[in-house]
Amino acid sequence: MSTAVQVDDVMRYRDSRFQTIAAKLLPTQYLVVDDDTALTTTLGSCVAACLRDPVLKIGGMNHFLLPEGQIGDGAPARYGSYAMELLINDMLKRGAHRKRIEAKVFGGANVLKGFTSNPVGTRNAEFVRQYLQAEHIPIIAEDLCGIHPRKVWFFATTGRVAVQRLPHAHEAEVAATESAVRARLSKAPVTGGVELFE
């Protein structure tokens, strides 16, 4: 039996598969850790970037819904550009060195029906690759695009990642969750800000 605890809006629980504490990230969330906590999330068309400074053994994960949004749009953390800045800046505040940061990226599946000409998943995957290239952060592993949702576990201290591709039976559930979050966030008030570091 596992007991879930909510800290900093991120739910933590005992993961029996890996015998460790896990922090489950939902869309728009990110978390940076320097311990054995497994960062985990479930992705459809969304993307998660797992960043790590291998010298400090500090790392973090984000989970974003869309590449970019309109200025003044509510809930900016749903957008990759903002979510990436939040994650990178938090790591830098904790002592990570920008030149040592490496990335592993996941998600971007095309699970949303009706988006065939310019699928959200493909746009998210293209965005994260371009963003990290522009920031000179190397991608050392990726599992992007395709048609299957994924569950991802990231262990920041070791850099290890486990990815489970979910069967088609989960597609509708993941797509419905992402659509519901998008609908809720489209009504959210504008909040937050980004502090940029050089």
Swiss-Prot record:
InterPro entries, sorted: CheD-like_sf, Chemorcpt_Glu_NH3ase_CheD, Cytotoxic_necrot_fac-like_cat
Entries under CDD domains matching the protein: CheD
GO molecular function, one term: protein-glutamine glutaminase activity
Keywords assigned: Chemotaxis, Hydrolase
GO BP: chemotaxis
Domain of life: Bacteria
Catalytic reaction annotation: L-glutaminyl-[protein] + H2O = L-glutamyl-[protein] + NH4(+)
The enzyme's E.C. designation: 3.5.1.44
Pfam families tied to this protein: CheD
Membership in a protein family: Belongs to the CheD family.
Function of the molecule: Probably deamidates glutamine residues to glutamate on methyl-accepting chemotaxis receptors (MCPs), playing an important role in chemotaxis.
PANTHER family recorded: CHEMORECEPTOR GLUTAMINE DEAMIDASE CHED-RELATED
Protein name: Probable chemoreceptor glutamine deamidase CheD
Encoding gene per record: cheD
